[in-house]
Amino acid sequence: MKMRFLFLLLAFSVQLTAQETRPPYWNDIQAFKKQDSTAFPGTGKILFVGSSSFTKWKDVQEYFPNHPIVNRGFGGSTLLDVTRYESDVIFPYQPKQVVIYCGENDIANDSSVTGKIVFERFKHLFTDIRSKLPRVPVVYISMKPSPSRWHMRSRVTEGNNRIKKFLKKKRNTVFVSVWKDMLGADGEPAKELFVEDRLHMNANGYAIWQRLLEPYLLK
């Protein structure tokens, strides 16, 4: 009886340790997998992947009714997170186009992360996508100017500029800048585009993204 108790205790301990060492957003990814197991969205669509600006865009398909979209934004993910889960949130869908919004959280989560580091992380993800999906167009939406993160703007703009310069030299890519269109007359983020947390957008903010992004989406 004592040995059995010790065995159960050890098994429970191992299970707890495994749960504690799971990478960030593991549960989000498992939720996608479960969803796909019962209702796989299909292949050959436009894939939106990235952080919470996509996660919270629940009605994205309504903004782009003529473009079939699979939204795989998750949590407050970073570029490292998207790269970690690329085999789960990108490649299974064999998309005809990939739209990425990510990088803001890399900067917000770590004061040592520079715009150059964000660019290097993006380049890693981009290289992975190109190696598996060489003919698939890639769209990157610039990191937005958020009121709550305005003090980080120098790092954000550096990252945007480096990514823009990099993509200019790559075929089948588009850099969609939302920066200027989200600024008010005072040159700061237009508060009316954001919800109370001053980070995530409301319908007015998403309407700007719709206008800037739609010309580049495949039918």
Question: What are the residue ranges of the model-derived segments?
Answer:
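Generic structural signal for well-ordered alpha-helices
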Residues: 86, 122-127, 160
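N-terminal secretory targeting modules
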Residues: 1-47, 54, 62-63, 219
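Extracellular glycan-modifying ectodomains
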Residues: 123, 127-128, 132, 145-148
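Catalytic His-Asp segment of secreted/periplasmic serine-dependent ester chemistry enzymes
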Residues: 145-219
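A short helix->loop->beta-strand "cap" motif at the edges of active sites that frequently abuts
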Residues: 133-137
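Conserved beta-strand elements of the Class I
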Residues: 47-49, 70
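Oxyanion-hole/transition-state-stabilizing segment in secreted/luminal serine hydrolases
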Residues: 54-63, 68-70, 81-119, 139, ...
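Short amphipathic alpha-helices and their capping/turn segments at secondary-structure boundaries
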Residues: 36-46, 84-92, 128-130
